[in-house]
Amino acid sequence: MRLWIVSVLVLTHLVHGALCWGKDGHYTVCKLAEGFFEDDTIAAVKKLLPESVDGGGLADFCSWPDEIKKLSQWQWTSTLHYVNTPEYRCNYEYCRDCHDTHKHKDWCVTGAIFNYTNQLMSASENSQNIVHYNLTEALLFLSHYMGDVHQPLHTGFLGDLGGNTIIVNWYHNKSNLHHVWDNMIIDSALETYYNSSLPHMIQALQAKLKNGWSNDVPSWKSCHFHQKACPNLYASESIDLACKYAYRNATPGTTLGDEYFLSRLPVVEKRLAQGGIRLAATLNRIFSAKPKLAGL
């Protein structure tokens, strides 16, 4: 019996809730990833997804960790969506930064990516380990956190909680800097360039992956030292981008308009694409292992 049957009821109820950037952004990352899945990955993901998807794919469930994190039984996951870094250092170090507010080590987005990668990898290599983990949850958490770590302000400064306490105006709307990067840049892009159609935006990013970014894709896929996942690299990239683009010219009270939007949108688009490529590469490395997940 599949271990995630009870969770399916929660999943199917929550995934159809109110739409937000979390759903759009994470849907985009996972939809891009699906286009790069190898055959073994396609088969494994299909086995792990809830049967109620009605033909849908991984992308339909990639916002689930955001939907559940405020529920009492899942509040422990809230710290796994980000990693805070010291003010103005503009760098990331796992041993220094990956902990929760109580200094429990490994409780951050990069630690979570390592953890859920190892869970899936352990079960893929040894079918006896399948019984120890909820592999559907592991897949969905890994897929979601891979998107989170590519959002620059999910590695932002501790002092402003990744831009959450920096109050700005996005055009005529009051917001905070983190929300601008989570929501407003993508929302404005959808309205301005894609007739408010997320599928059209995804198609545009898919075209860039085949053309403008095609020479970069192999390096995006690669992982040093034969690791299955490289979240430390992704977090280091993100805090560098946060300093160069997110925080720059975005002090409290600033009105952010066309200049900020047009110069930051390419960064957001590329991070969505990199997140998709790297999620696919990670899952391909995991599910290429023997034996397969035959016990599911």
From Swiss-Prot:
Keywords: Disulfide bond, Endonuclease, Glycoprotein, Hydrolase, Metal-binding, Nuclease, Signal, Zinc. Coiled coil: none annotated. A divalent metal cation 1 binds at residues 66, 81, 144, 148. Its EC number is 3.1.30.1. Glycans are attached at residues 115, 134, 173, 195. Residues 144-193 are annotated as: Substrate binding. Gene3D superfamilies: P1 Nuclease. Disulfide bonds join 30-62, 90-243, 98-108, 223-230. It catalyses: Endonucleolytic cleavage to 5'-phosphomononucleotide and 5'-phosphooligonucleotide end-products. Optimum pH is 8 with RNA and ssDNA as substrates. InterPro entries: PLipase_C/P1_nuclease_dom_sf, S1/P1nuclease. GO terms for biological process: DNA catabolic process. Its cofactor is Zn(2+). GO terms for molecular function: endonuclease activity; metal ion binding; nucleic acid binding; RNA endonuclease activity; single-stranded DNA endodeoxyribonuclease activity; T/G mismatch-specific endonuclease activity. Residues 281-296 form a propeptide. CDD domains: S1-P1_nuclease. Substrate binds at residues 21-26, 66-72, 81-84, 91-96, 115, 133. Binds 3 divalent metal cations. A divalent metal cation 3 binds at residues 21, 26, 148. Hydrolyzes, with low efficiency, only single-stranded DNA and RNA without apparent specificity for bases. Endonuclease that recognizes and cleaves some mismatches with high efficiency, including heteroduplex double-stranded DNA; mostly efficient on T/G, A/G and G/G mismatches, less efficient for T/T and poorly efficient for C/C, A/A, T/C and A/C. Belongs to the nuclease type I family. This is Endonuclease 5. It comes from Arabidopsis thaliana. The gene is ENDO5.
